């Protein structure tokens, strides 16, 4: 059974709403156990427990929040070398479009790669011209169905990669590749 940790920081509640949708998406794959934790509550033990990690941060001047950076420095720093090969992805909410949330996601992915995480983007489209290559991004709270689906799709894909690479469920790979719902006309 795959184990997914969704960790987030939030100032206004918007990134928390995204995190809840990411967790919902991960739970949609049968056999996936999910923990949802605010960055202030997440521990080393949570990270060691998880096979996959979804990290969400509000965008702060185009970057991650200071609390999320502190988590990487103070909590994950103690796990250097122990968490290589876990699977991870990113999501972020900004105050408005163009607020830097894709850059924040890339910052999260960069930090994860430094710890040896295997990171991924999602090639699917959840709406016309609406994709999540670097992670799920939203301006404000996720209101539209495309924004909500982007979060759920990210969590689902994390659970699928964990199932494929950790649990050996290779049959899911062809299902992902051939799913006609991945692309919107």
UniProtKB/Swiss-Prot annotation:
Low-potential electron donor to a number of redox enzymes. Its cofactor is FMN. GO terms for cellular component: membrane. SUPFAM superfamilies: Flavoproteins. GO terms for molecular function: electron transfer activity; FMN binding; NAD(P)H dehydrogenase (quinone) activity. Belongs to the flavodoxin family. Coiled coil: none annotated. The gene is fldA. This is Flavodoxin. Residues 4-159 form the Flavodoxin-like domain.
